[in-house]
Amino acid sequence: MKKNNFYITTPIYYPSGQPHMGHAYSSIIADVFARFKRNDNFKVFFLTGTDEHGLKIQKSAEKAGLKPLDYCNEISKIFKDLTKKLNLSNDDFIRTTEKRHYKSVNYLWDKLIKSGDIYLSKYKGWYSVSDEAYYNEEEIVEKNGKKISTFSGSPVEWVEEDSFFFKLSAWQDKLLDFYEKNKKFILPSSRRNEVIQFVKSGLKDLSVSRTSLSWGIKVPNKNEHVIYVWLDALTNYLSALNYPNIEEDLYKDFWPASLHVIGKDILRFHAVYWPAFLLAAKIDPPIRVFGHGWILSGDEKMSKSKGNILNPLEIINNYGIDELRYYLMKEVSHGSDGSISLKSLENCINSDLANNYGNLCQRVFSFIKNNCKNKVKKTKNLSNADIDLINKTNNLTKNLRSEMDNQNLNNYLKSVINISFLTNKYINDEEPWKLKKDNVEKMNNILHLSLEQIAKISILLNPVIPLASKKVLDSLNIKEDSRNLSFLDGNAVIPSEANISNLDILFRKIN
């Protein structure tokens, strides 16, 4: 990968049902990082898509009375439409039923066969259709007369069939060595510890084909076998870069991937199986896997099977997309589970967006319109209050790149919204409305610094609330190519003589 390039992915979503808040959460996280990197002058490739093979899809299609591909065409379109409704900035949307993906999977399979890492044997063990995952005997318990996975709580069934196996056991020490040399491969650190403990407990060879289903990519020269959905699905991160065409610019520019954003429930596949497949194929693993927590309704994970889903589209229609994006990013701590509710959403909109940032923008723009004819000119005479605000802002912004590079999104947002709070306080303390008659120069300095603060805050919030941010930056008449993070290196955003346009209300308070 070239320097200052950034390849970020969401998990590709399993379209066995309608999208829910968990899908929205993963996608928005990835979009925020992608937008932030673009604002920091990185060349970004942002991928999302749908994972369309496997037994669960086959059964869902049968239930709907459709052929699997027809079913996938319908549901995948819903997920693709969701990217627009979530205001995602993805560069590609991949489907695992596309020819480019089949080509990549077949090539990777052949490499693993030739390297001796895949062999034919017989599988006997527990399998979860819901998880599309195999489980060991020690990972199974009986509950209410049914066998379930201790990992996910999903029901499992006993399976016996001929199967190709990947020699995962041969990669145990090599994976542990890889984790040791790449200490930030898995974040947060709690997830890293989980993975290391799992690998240290002993790895068994992994079944990577099925003969008991028909919907999937056929094993080359063994068409009675279908490639295991996870080996198939994970390869999407390569196929979007036209692998195996490794001499093309797209692949050379963006592999290895900078960041896989995933839910913690699929961490094992991304942090154990995926790097093992890649290392066996002599392909560099991704730089980072970030396993975020679950979005909870009360104390339970939101999922289709539990019927406790909050519909993101309903919330967008009722509250707005910027509002939902901000709330999800602010509410859920770094890598932890987060419980959401409409009440806490409304409180967040009121406290942070309407009363804080929105109020700051509105009061400054309105005052300049009514008292300065939308023009403000600063002088070099800074007051102690001006210097104090500038210093406090610099202290809050100096670690923002690091926070984002370590996926500390909620810490990032707390710092940014605190800058808005401090700027509101500065205006309250300095009272520019009292200076119009006797000290116009000081009034102008206060207003100009306030505009500079608003510009910085809006650029920093742009990855999270891009629609509102654009309205403010448009009204500040800041050129598109100047809406970047160069001010973190000491550059000004607002010219010494600022001309602004009118600004409508950004966020309405919810009563």
Residues covered by each model-derived region:
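Basic, alpha-helical terminal appendages of large translation-related enzymes
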Residues: M1-N5, P19, F45, G49, ...
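A glycine-rich helix N-cap at a beta->alpha junction
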Residues: I75-D91
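Active-site-proximal binding-pocket segments
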Residues: L267, L328-E331, G335, S341, ...
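A charged helix-plus-loop insertion that forms the helical arch/lid used to bind
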Residues: S60-N73
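Structured secondary-structure scaffolds
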Residues: M1-T48, R100-S104, I148-N370, Y412-V416
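Short, charge-patterned binding micro-sites
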Residues: T50-K56
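Feature captures the FAD/FMN-dependent oxidoreductase FAD-binding
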Residues: T97-D117, Y127-S128
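Short, cysteine/histidine-rich loop/knuckle motifs that typically chelate Zn2+
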Residues: V129-S130, F151
